[in-house]
């Protein structure tokens, strides 16, 4: 018996997609802040955390994928 099923894979895929969109939006915001001369130190640090979280979500997605035997 697999620990994950197709619903888990769909959920993981959705989480990754949402996190990718969030990261892209925030990255664009940080670039705009930099262009306007704002201090982006904290924003850039947060962007790194977003990327780390996204990477973890992708790892989880791959685990679910392997367990369900599905293809993305």
Feature names for model-found ranges:
Residues 1-72:
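Anionic, Ser/Thr-rich low-complexity intrinsically disordered regions
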């Amino acid at each position: 018996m697999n620990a994950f099923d197709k619903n888990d894979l769909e959920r993981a895929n959705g989480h990754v997609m949402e996190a990718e969109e969030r990261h892209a939006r925030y990255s664009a915001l940080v670039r705009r802040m930099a262009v306007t001369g704002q201090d982006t130190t904290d924003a850039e640090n947060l962007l790194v955390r977003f990327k780390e979280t996204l990477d973890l979500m992708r790892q989880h997605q791959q685990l679910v994928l392997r367990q369900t035997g599905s293809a993305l």
